Amino acid sequence: MELHSHLNAEHQTAFEHVIQHLKEKRIRITETRKAVVAYIIESDDHPSAEMIYLDLLPNYPNMSLATVYNNLKVLLEEGFVTELKRANDTTTYDEVMEHEHHN
């Protein structure tokens, strides 16, 4: 069962927008990439890569922490997330719903 199948309508629209944008940029869409995108969209707080990794690991046991970081890097480069540097040297991530298409 895929994580994003439980998104509410607003989150589903945002999810589809992100995935479509990545496809248009010829960025490979993997199940773990979709899971990270859905996680960020659904998150009410600002998760760290480690938090995302630990929460998704039970459903994606072959996923590595590096995979999460790589996916966050792509989402950051494409303008879908922002990095938030915390005082304790932790970096957390926040979704950007107002993403504009930049081609």
Show which residues each predicted segment covers.
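Non-DNA-binding regulatory cores of transcription-related proteins
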Residues: 77-103
